[in-house]
Swiss-Prot record:
Keyword Cytoplasm: yes
Main location: cytoplasm
PANTHER family given in the database record: SSRA-BINDING PROTEIN, TMRNA-BINDING COMPONENT OF TRANS-TRANSLATION TAGGING COMPLEX
One Pfam family matching this protein: SmpB
GO molecular function term, any single one: RNA binding
Keyword Mitochondrion: no
Protein name stated in the entry: SsrA-binding protein
Keywords: Cytoplasm, RNA-binding
Name of the gene this protein is made from: smpB
Signal peptide: none
Source organism per UniProt: Pseudomonas syringae pv. syringae (strain B728a)
Subcellular location(s) per record: Cytoplasm
Similarity comment: Belongs to the SmpB family.
InterPro entries from the UniProt entry: SmpB (IPR023620), SsrA-bd_prot (IPR000037), SsrA-bd_prot_CS (IPR020081)
């Protein structure tokens, strides 16, 4: 089996849908409590964050909806649950800030990415406000106009 190339930033998976659906206001770095088979699957980049979010309950943060696919070579005596809730490790001040902000109307806490930081797995979570449909269209229009501008600049340089 060929070795997988390491991502230069150590990113394992990203939640691009969260950036599309929310205005990201604050980002936090949280540790993840994982079992052995989950770490092996993360090394093989078998993780999806598409519909994952953070649940704040009883002064703790939990990652919900994150799907880590178990490897076929994983241990047979452990029953692997790919969508189990995983505890996020944050300090008290960060938890209080998240809890107070989520209780406000329109704020949500979502997972943006999972990455390696040295030998530890970290999860980047963000506090965001939901976008309306017209906000999404406006963002798309801005992105298209920026692309057109870059193309014009690039073609102008080639003519000279």
């Amino acid at each position: 089996m060929a070795k997988l190339k390491k991502h230069p930033t150590g990113t394992i998976a990203q939640n691009k849908k969260a950036r599309h659906d929310y205005f990201i206001e604050h980002k936090f770095e949280a540790g993840l409590v994982l079992s052995g088979w989950e770490v092996k699957s993360l090394r093989a980049t078998k993780v999806q964050l598409v519909d994952s979010y953070v649940l704040l309950k009883d002064g703790e943060a939990w990652l919900m909806g994150c799907h880590i696919t178990p490897l076929k070579t994983a241990s047979t005596h452990v029953i692997a649950d790919p969508t189990r809730t995983r505890k996020l490790l944050l300090n008290k001040r960060e938890l209080e800030k998240l809890t107070s902000s989520v209780q406000q109307k329109g704020y949500a806490c979502v997972a943006l990415s999972v990455y390696w930081k040295e030998h530890l797995v970290k999860c980047e979570i963000a506090l965001g406000k939901g976008k309306k449909e017209y906000d999404k269209r406006h963002t798309e229009r801005e992105r298209d106009s920026d692309r057109e501008l870059q193309r014009a600049v690039r073609s102008k340089g080639k003519d000279d």
